[in-house]
Amino acid sequence: GLVCLIEEQPAVLICDLPSEENEQFQLKKYGLYALKHTYNQGIIFKGFAVPAENLLQVNRGNGLTIAYHGLNLGRVALCANAAGTMRLMMASMIPWGQFRRTYGEAIADRELVRRRLGRMAGLIVACDALVAWCSTMLDQGYRGEMECIVAKIFGSEAQKEAAIELFMKTHGGRSFLHGHLFGDNVHEYLAPCIYEGEGEMLGMAFFKSLVKHHGSTYFEPIGKALHAAGIKKPNPFNPGHAWALKGPLS
């Protein structure tokens, strides 16, 4: 699927990529710390022809509606991947805790390490629950956009916390050895905070979605009435201002 602009409107096209590069289609190779386990290449299109019948049509919205649906699926997948990744971390922490001894006792018996394992177990269960919730809604035909945003933000932040605060600190200096699960994959653990939408930006988008209906229903008419009356600094104690707002506030 290719997201593009057609007559200044977002659209999605289904396109078949050529088997080799040509003047209209080239691959851009670049270094990337994250996703190093995948075959990652940039794609450059120059006058690339796509049949008109490959344009996807939607009953409501435009191409962004299709793109956002794909993002929703990706955000749920991110949360599911976080749960699986944290399971791998825990599977490494438990035997290490039994092997590593300090002051004559395995660190697995220390309350600090037990707290970390308990915290990670809770994060895993929470991610599993969010995946089940969101995937069920999507399977039933709901857009689930806000729910998937919650899953993405929580899953990425949970994985970051688990990697840095729980996994790395339990393994100590060994975390930075070549071949260690943390050192070899630290960028993979942090990338979800950025990919599929940066977390804090998504949080603001989530809030905007929550208040959009209320704002357009109640506050927008007030703004329009003030603009029509030429009032830039409304004063509720000014009778003229109050009269201008009698409609929206009634």
Name each model feature, range by range:
Residues 145-242:
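Alpha-helix capping/hinge segments and adjacent helical runs
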Residues 7-8, 38-43, 71, 181, ...:
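Short, solvent-exposed loop/turn segments at the edges of secondary structure
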Residues 98-105, 136-143, 172:
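Short, flexible helix-adjacent loops and helix caps
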Residues 1-3, 12-14, 42-44, 152-154, ...:
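Structured core elements
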Residues 114-169:
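Gly/Pro-rich turn-and-neighbor structural signature
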Residues 26-123, 192-193, 208, 223-250:
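Glycine-rich beta->alpha junctions and the first turn(s) of the following alpha-helix
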Residues 1-25:
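A short core secondary-structure module
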